[in-house]
């Protein structure tokens, strides 16, 4: 019987534990573990996935910006994704971030940074129509959030009407900020809960999150949440039309009636940012609310737009957290892993050491630059730290304790899996195997293809993928669709019934939408969110494959790095052949509106009344109306109690406000097209 590798077993255990804890906390509002325990398990999982990149699954808690919305509230799509921030844990990492973004914008003279205290609460997105608060939503997973407008209205520091005195009157404004519980209020709430025999809240952040998701807004009102605004957007317009910088945006928020954290500061250099961070390390303990770090943003909106986003983070901002526990240990070996993108990641295998109640024995060394910077060698005594209290990281080498016989570590010149020469491209820190036939890359690409957020092929797990590659049954993801039950039965522990079931599951994956196929291709930097953004713009693979790089970069949320990666991917002959094979196999490389919406006249909207308002991302309003009518729906010009759906674009106007007051369901263009495809 084949033994499951300890790291595989532990990774799966951690995912299940964290998913159970997230469900209990976010959906049931009944935490089953302490926040610190969740953080510890999360960081352990994160470290395992860093050490074993091939174990990273799209449905892992580490791949989420937040949690999926519960069903008790209406799910709504954020007009602009609500991203989380990349973390740094010391000044060196802050400087590293500063150097990274500067490499993307080399011709820049001076730059300003805005530093803000990182409030430990819950992120909210607020929508104002003609100055009136019409919607408040949670972060959710960054793309979809929950409509908690009734609860948001109870927070006294959130204005129900914006103050436009002396300002341009804006038709639509979106404000982002943090809802939190002041420490004194938190203390009073727990005292009351103790008297009532109720379970106490673990900390102010949990209390704030649980309060916001109360179905009874009267309870929310009693808990006296507070709110600090920290940014704003003007849908349908360039944000620079009202503010050119983050500093100006904060000033504008104050003028509009929002409470803004008074401790923000404009800094002229990273050195000044570092001083701000060091000052608040101790001073924050005197604040009337919880804060766990400092948020650093580039002040210029123009520069922010140039830098764009990764799948999860803006490149122009970072959260600088406060330091964690450190301890000495000995490096016993330096191993090198190969991920699905071919990246070679060095890992320090260390004598086990206790940090924050857990045993640490491995730590990522990131790349050869980091190894050279540390001058780390096998046999060295090092200081290992748990960044963010959990992620193990080697922070320095105690060279005075170095044994005489040690030698500098050199990254391999050939892939440790396929033995082909590796490359390091100019300007990159990562060494890569570029052999498309490398077993490690192929296994990783297939595991990614079959994962839940991609083609979601049930029954095709890691062990089976490895068998398929090792026995040379597949050379690419397209080969999966040529597998037969007879071929599969030759594999270890694969019977006829299981083989037939797997063949059927593979065939069913041909029905997955274009956005999932694009994500499954594993193009560098293209996550599931980016794939959705791309397929909302480009309805067919041909449109995307022939798009200009500058046009791809113009999509909100798709920065230069992603655009370049997508553009270059479609110019590789092997990738073009893969697309041709997938098309021949019948996979969906076309968005629903190109295939079914104009197709068989399915009357799925029969008896339903629609109103279309605002500017849609890709469809003209008449085109949207035609699609609805072809599916049996009725389209009217005004919102009433008889309206079933409001299809909303940018600059929706008063129709949206009326629809919200009547409780009418709103649909984005993407949601409309998804319904047409069902």
From Swiss-Prot:
Residues the record marks as active site: 118 (n6-amp-lysine intermediate)
Domain BRCT: 600-678
Classification via CDD domains: BRCT_DNA_ligase_like (cd17748), LIGANc (cd00114)
Any one GO molecular function term: DNA binding
Any one of the GO BP annotations: DNA replication
Binding sites annotated in the UniProt record for NAD(+): 35-39, 84-85, 116, 139, 178, 297, 321
Top enzyme category: ligase
Catalyzed reactions per annotation: NAD(+) + (deoxyribonucleotide)n-3'-hydroxyl + 5'-phospho-(deoxyribonucleotide)m = (deoxyribonucleotide)n+m + AMP + beta-nicotinamide D-nucleotide
Highest taxon listed in the record's lineage: Bacteria
EC annotation from Swiss-Prot or TrEMBL: 6.5.1.2
Cofactors named for this entry: Mg(2+); Mn(2+)
Binding site for Zn(2+): 415, 418, 433, 438
InterPro entries given in the database record: BRCT_dom, BRCT_dom_sf, DisA/LigA_HHH, DNA_ligase, DNA_ligase_AS, DNA_ligase_CS, DNAligase_adenylation, DNAligase_N
Keywords: DNA damage, DNA repair, DNA replication, Ligase, Magnesium, Manganese, Metal-binding, NAD, Zinc
Cellular component, GO annotation: cytosol
Protein purpose: DNA ligase that catalyzes the formation of phosphodiester linkages between 5'-phosphoryl and 3'-hydroxyl groups in double-stranded DNA using NAD as a coenzyme and as the energy source for the reaction. It is essential for DNA replication and repair of damaged DNA.
Family according to the record: Belongs to the NAD-dependent DNA ligase family. LigA subfamily.
Name of the molecule in the record: DNA ligase
Organism: Nostoc punctiforme (strain ATCC 29133 / PCC 73102)
Lineage of origin: Bacteria, Bacillati, Cyanobacteriota, Cyanophyceae, Nostocales
The gene coding this protein: ligA
